[in-house]
């Protein structure tokens, strides 16, 4: 069974940077050793935003974007190796999620698309890459997401305490770690995505630092109720979503009914939308004693305060409190999934994704010996 140093690479729906994590992984433990966040050039970020919102590209433009992202991921890995004074031979493999540009797990031909050419990463780092993690699950009738609950269960499940892990990235997803029950998990809806999109358009800021804008505004209740009427929120699990659905166009359609509103009030309403949709799903799933938050949303003081207020009797904390960096959780999960793939172990949970069976995930892009 492969064990040793693995690198996880994650570029999430928030597009706030490429997260790269170095960890030692074997069948008994996952020990994080180092991490870094690598910036995404504004031009690349905008290109990804455009394609996620349905803007047409030529095949040439699409191919260039795939190559550019692969090179970006390789640069991020090489920066971490240099920082840690490591060579390619010191790493077993890289687990690279890729950049999701479209996720459509239902319909006549279900599919999901993550780009960032893994061949570029192998060529530029000299390290074996495991990528394309989601499509095998979809081929077996699953949603292809979320995949991280299996990792949450391996690291954070408790024999007696009802726990849930909440990742608030661009999309928010919940892992249900309830003793005596199969692991559950699904996307609750928008996490930071709409808040980030709004402040980017209104103020040119990548995100609302410390919720300053949202805290200066007031929740517009009719707008909140209008957004909460979206059918996704009442759809039963398994379910997953992404930027192709909850994007700036979605927000604009709801704002048409509310002309002339204060931008800060919209920011406050979007924060409340995230908090309310998450807390409703926690309660619908039977509640928990401890809700452990990871992802960028864990640094949003307004979101954390609203979750605590909406979930009385639940201890709302971050995964940092139990020794796992909330910022690095997803990248660490894909390093772990790469280890499972190389070990021939399944990486999905049918109780989460709805797939017909457990399966080994991903494709292996081997480095030259």
Curated annotation (Swiss-Prot):
Pathway annotation from the record: Amino-sugar metabolism; 1,6-anhydro-N-acetylmuramate degradation; Cell wall biogenesis; peptidoglycan recycling
A GO molecular-function annotation: ATP binding
Binding site for ATP: 12-19
The protein's name in its UniProt record: Anhydro-N-acetylmuramic acid kinase
EC number assigned by the record: 2.7.1.170
Keywords: ATP-binding, Carbohydrate metabolism, Kinase, Nucleotide-binding, Transferase
Organism: Escherichia coli O1:K1 / APEC
GO BP annotations listed: 1,6-anhydro-N-acetyl-beta-muramic acid catabolic process; amino sugar metabolic process; peptidoglycan turnover
Function, in words: Catalyzes the specific phosphorylation of 1,6-anhydro-N-acetylmuramic acid (anhMurNAc) with the simultaneous cleavage of the 1,6-anhydro ring, generating MurNAc-6-P. Is required for the utilization of anhMurNAc either imported from the medium or derived from its own cell wall murein, and thus plays a role in cell wall recycling.
Superkingdom of source: Bacteria
Database matches in CDD domains: ASKHA_NBD_ANMK (cd24050)
Reactions listed under catalytic activity: 1,6-anhydro-N-acetyl-beta-muramate + ATP + H2O = N-acetyl-D-muramate 6-phosphate + ADP + H(+)
Gene: anmK
UniProt similarity note: Belongs to the anhydro-N-acetylmuramic acid kinase family.
